[in-house]
């Protein structure tokens, strides 16, 4: 029997073969705590067999089996039964777009293709570019082409260091290089930009699957189907939907396979002006859009101008950021994804019946003008024609190439599909993996699904989007933190407070730059905000935090790719940044930063509580990311996959003194007792009245729940509530957080006397 999905709690599964772990048995031991917290469903990261020692599970090597490292099928069955006995259920993250091939010997399908080539039973499972290598699969696994000379034959294997590859039957005689020349694959240096198969973005160790082939879908989803047939699982999250050839077709097959009652949400990164395609047979998205709205409504718009001036003082013309992003898209297409661009060119030329030297440049230029991950959903039909027209208007010299693109795409088929897949990959590499590490104005806005150039979200827009979601997607996921977010929810909340005190932050940055100038001013401003976001209130920087900050700084500057990068590390610049960071952590600025954090921490906690209560009560199904019941200082992965101290959280849940777990437990428990108010209930804004009315965001869910949170508390601290009231609907209302009772026009000063948020329940409801 499936249970209605009212809320979820995400855990990161991990085998114990690589340090700490979190298996099905560990999850089973957590169920009593989650049940007490009020969670309806435990939400598992990918659980199919992945590369040995995988720390995340997105590198699945065998889609037909549950990971033995996690406890196998028996462990999953025990976990499901234990959850069912408590009236709870399971949600599982699935990865249809790709599989892990970084260790070829662990992926039987990939191994078979490498061994038998086009005659393999699995040759059509992968999106292989057979033309690129004259019938051989190009594998960019070498440091340089000359490494082929070091290949050695070991029985029916070719070896190079830790790399092992199969030898085709009857081709194993001779030296390593000679045997290599007779294989169905060809090893090349990775710097050539050649790859013989579609990848997950530019990650060579993740090979794309052809889910559009029904045989591939059936083979890769048989195990997932079993979970639903046997009643083990109630829903799935679909990873990287836009990487598929036909997302809509895939979801239609998935819905048919899993049944009408399965809860299906999709990882779909939506542009600010983009709606989730209404024809998709799903319950909604994974909530990046809601994350942007919640974070944005708490940002103080008065901070935009001074924070813009501050980042421009470092030599950045903020008005040029859109042009920079456009250039990054071109770079991603032409360089990072060069192999995919070459393949698309051949497809377009074949479909159009002609080629042109300007075709690659035309594709890259076109992608500059497509402001979303892909635009072939029915509701986005106008995007590509408009982008073609805009590209022609700005770069008329590319007309010959644009004409070929238009002609080929109009016919549909492979060129149209590959253009869309390249568009998504280009967007990810340019925006999330680079631009979000360059924009230093207010880095809490640099989030998956976010738009940093839009400084916050107005209350009217917030209410409009929430009401629309209540009507169209009432069971969509809402979230504040995921394994993909650039920083944890509480880190974002603290950084967001800088929008309220831009003058104070500018003063600190000016002093910091004078005492400890960063190797690069913009890099310094970017890193300073992140350091501020995780800085302990006590000012005591542990060895663990020091290491985490150094790891983060190195990742950030390589992703930004201004002075160093993953492909071409600039060790001198990186050493300078590490030295500067040590000076920050150990020098005189540390005490000054501690004072600033202490001064603003109450405001940061207020925003964090407001964001959490909003996420738990706006239309949708809220997800709680592991460990975020208490203040969480996580940064980007792998930092956000650290082990969680559940002993401390169990104690906190019993005491309910910590404000965050208090808010969380009250809201989750209320959702469980009043599901009709949250899953089916309407959304109605409630407006405060008085001089400080703008400091309140409030709404009703159904007839018996009213939520109100405060914002912009720095200004509020200066002005006070000054007779501001919140008009409550008829009846008596009790705050589930404090027990405070109210009715009628209630003074805000009384309503928010104990906490900056209230969760009101109509008495006798």
From Swiss-Prot:
It comes from the Bacteria. One of its GO terms (molecular function) is (1,4)-alpha-D-glucan 1-alpha-D-glucosylmutase activity. It catalyses: 4-[(1->4)-alpha-D-glucosyl](n-1)-D-glucose = 1-[(1->4)-alpha-D-glucosyl](n-1)-alpha-D-glucose. GO terms for biological process: alpha-glucan catabolic process; trehalose biosynthetic process. Keywords: Isomerase. It is an enzyme of class 5 (isomerase). Pfam families: Alpha-amylase (PF00128). One of its GO terms (cellular component) is cytosol. InterPro entries: Glyco_hydro_13_cat_dom (IPR006047), Glycoside_hydrolase_SF (IPR017853), Maltooligo_trehalose_synth_4 (IPR013797), Trehalose_TreY (IPR012767). Transmembrane segments: none annotated. Catalyzes the conversion of maltooligosaccharide into the non-reducing saccharide, maltooligosyl trehalose (alpha-maltooligosyl alpha-D-glucoside) by intramolecular transglycosylation. Monomer. PANTHER family: ALPHA-AMYLASE FAMILY MEMBER, MALTOOLIGOSYL TREHALOSE SYNTHASE-RELATED. Belongs to the glycosyl hydrolase 13 family. This is Putative maltooligosyl trehalose synthase. It comes from Mycobacterium tuberculosis (strain ATCC 25618 / H37Rv).
